[in-house]
Amino acid sequence: MIALRIVVCLWLSLLATNLNAEDVPDEDLQGLWGLRLVAFAQNFPAYPSSSDQNFTALPIPYPVYRGKIFSFGQDLEEIASGQLLSTNRFNVSVGLNASFPESSDNLSARNGMPDLDFLVEAGPEVNMALKGGPDDDRELLLSLQIRGAVSIDDLDATGRGFTFNPELEYLVRDFLDAKTELRFRVSPTWGTSDYTDFFYGVDPEYATANRPAFDAASGYVNTEFLVGVNRKISDRLEFRGSIRLWVNKGSANETSPLYQQDYGRGIRLALYWTAWESERRVASTD
């Protein structure tokens, strides 16, 4: 029965993408399937409020699928998404994103504590166009996201609670020219106690004279401010970059010994090269 449902969902996705492509100009079409190589570098705080930065630079090959109902591999921000309901100005979907692990040996406040494992977050989101639309040069978007978090250590998975994450994003298409897009985003985050404990909790066995035991509380985590630019260099090559500021002040866990600073900064630079695309074309959603 489950296999039948999967087949039906994939069939509906293929049917929807075919119908969607019929009314789209050729220059706005991309392959339904593709293979990309992304070379990216980022320098972010190791965790919210950490004074230690996590620098990551990797080349990653990965497949891309641009289905109308289900898609994956189109952006580093969101690994995969599934559309539950979609109109020109409103959609309900399920999203999946992840964070890199970090060794506590490299973190001044967490030295001697368990590592911060690979963190996967998934859940529903409601996206609304408050002003403009996908065909306009300017668009104001509101996204309301709920994510369930799971940390993964080898084959062990541990539930890490939930987050609520509203996002307000302003898109400027055709910035300077038709190949450049500018975006501004404000995104506060609230988390349950299981989520905040992952970053700020200190079990008694890891307590020291300078790091007392601490039970993390649910509540406000921080707010992210982002300025990003996407630049299409050629049909196969695209640059995406962003700078970010995190405001941690006012966090529900400011008194944690693992809370280190009120502000954080970050940068991400990425080059996306499309190595291959299928002959079947669909409307671009990148």
How would you name each of these model-derived features?
Residues 22-33, 49, 68-91, 131-140, ...:
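Short loop/turn motifs that connect adjacent beta-strands in outer-membrane beta-barrel proteins
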Residues 25, 48-53, 104-110, 153-160, ...:
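Outer-membrane beta-barrel translocator domains and adjoining extracellular loop/strand segments
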Residues 33, 53-59, 88, 116-122, ...:
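Residues that define the transmembrane beta-barrel architecture of outer-membrane proteins
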Residues 36-42, 75, 93-97, 141-147, ...:
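Transmembrane beta-strands of outer-membrane beta-barrel proteins
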Residues 39-43, 59-65, 78-83, 122-130, ...:
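Residues on the lipid-exposed face of transmembrane beta-strands in outer-membrane beta-barrel proteins
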Residues 42-48, 99-105, 129-133, 147-155, ...:
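Sequence/structural signature of outer-membrane beta-barrel proteins
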Residues 58-60, 262-286:
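Outer-membrane beta-barrel "beta-signal"
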Residues 156-238, 247-251, 258:
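Outer-membrane beta-barrel transmembrane domain signature
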